[in-house]
Amino acid sequence: MLDLSLPSGLRDLLPDHSAHLAELSAKLQEVFSQFGYRRLFLPTLERLDVVERGLSAAALADVMKFVEPGSGEVVAIRPDITPQIARLYAARPDALPSPARLCYDGPVLRAREARAGRPREVYQAGVELLGAGGASADAEALVVLARALERVGLGSAVVEVGHARFAHAVIDAAGLAPKARGAAWDALSRKDEGALAALARRARGSAGARAALPELATLYGDGALARARALARQVPGAAAALGEVEAALRLARRRGVEAVSVDLGETRGLGYYTGVTFAGYAPGAGSAVAAGGRYDELLARFGRPGPAIGFAVDLEFATQALERANGRAKRPARPRRSPPRPR
């Protein structure tokens, strides 16, 4: 008998659901265009060396690759669109002067079976601001994301802001042994203050840094910025990261973005992001509906160094949140704090 099932982790999208995704993507592209972002259409396949150059070490296991019969080249189905845009930005400076505001939508495919029933093929829409650094660019990304979520009907979403180097500064200053550093990152990903306190007692760094280590697990929600300022006085390396977060928030609020919270213990995107990070959380979604951040080291890997920041909206999770908000879902879902993986 003919087996009509799909490969594991893949699914068909029927007309009603497809219509929801198409409508959502069109509204997002409308907002991106209003902010000056120009749309790109990119191929599904890339050379493997290009894809690998643009991914974090943790994301390399997500690459689905094969030998192209005609050329013998090893090619990959894109697991992320950002490296493709970095490749194009480096290859075509004539067509993409700096700063470049670019947007896209389309599917990405990941080799591993996703956790918690998440499909391997994910539909995204996003923006990349290439060649622009500093607080103004960080704030612009926050504003575009907030306005995009409002436009699609997720005005109740909250944008949570962090920084890739804040926790790094504390963990570096605490003086942990290499094995203990890995344990610290694992504990922080679980917001396990007790485990961090136990590690701090065995650390060899300054007293201030050791005291700050368990505090990382508490630096989210109301009062997080005030607690972070006190912590940063004990760990000078954390002060610069905190200053970048506060500058971006200040400018974003001047432009009317109020639904913002802070999580300076966020571990998403380790080894990929270099500055301000952010994620959008909406009631009813199974995970973050959007995620992004600053990745200033990526463009240099493709031969055109420069700062960059961007984000992607997960169309499936955004649709899920909208359906629950409109009462179409059968049962409520508890949103998880962390996105499923870095962009």
Swiss-Prot record:
State the SUPFAM superfamilies in the record. Class II aaRS and biotin synthetases (SSF55681)
Region Disordered: list its residue ranges: 324-343
Stretches of Basic residues bias are at: 327-343
Which InterPro entries does its entry note? aa-tRNA-synth_II, aa-tRNA-synth_II/BPL/LPL, HisRS-like_core, HisRS/HisZ, HisZ
**GO BP terms:** histidyl-tRNA aminoacylation; L-histidine biosynthetic process
Per the record, the pathway is:
Amino-acid biosynthesis; L-histidine biosynthesis; L-histidine from 5-phospho-alpha-D-ribose 1-diphosphate: step 1/9
Alphabetical UniProt keywords: Amino-acid biosynthesis, Cytoplasm, Histidine biosynthesis
Which GO-annotated molecular functions does the record name?
histidine-tRNA ligase activity
Domain of life per record? Bacteria
Give the subcellular location: Cytoplasm
Pfam families in the cross-refs = tRNA-synt_His
What would be one Gene Ontology cellular-component term for the protein?
A: cytoplasm
Name the residues that span the membrane.
Answer: none
Extra facts: This function is generally fulfilled by the C-terminal part of HisG, which is missing in some bacteria such as this one.
Q: Which family does it belong to?
A: Belongs to the class-II aminoacyl-tRNA synthetase family. HisZ subfamily.
The record's section on NCBIfam families has:
hisZ_biosyn_reg (TIGR00443)
State what this protein does: Required for the first step of histidine biosynthesis. May allow the feedback regulation of ATP phosphoribosyltransferase activity by histidine.
Self-association state and partner proteins as the record states: Heteromultimer composed of HisG and HisZ subunits.
Identify the PANTHER family for this entry.
Answer: HISTIDINE--TRNA LIGASE, MITOCHONDRIAL-RELATED, HISTIDYL-TRNA SYNTHETASE
**Cited HAMAP family:** HisZ (MF_00125)
Question: What protein am I looking at?
Answer: ATP phosphoribosyltransferase regulatory subunit
Tell me the organism.
Answer: Anaeromyxobacter sp. (strain Fw109-5)
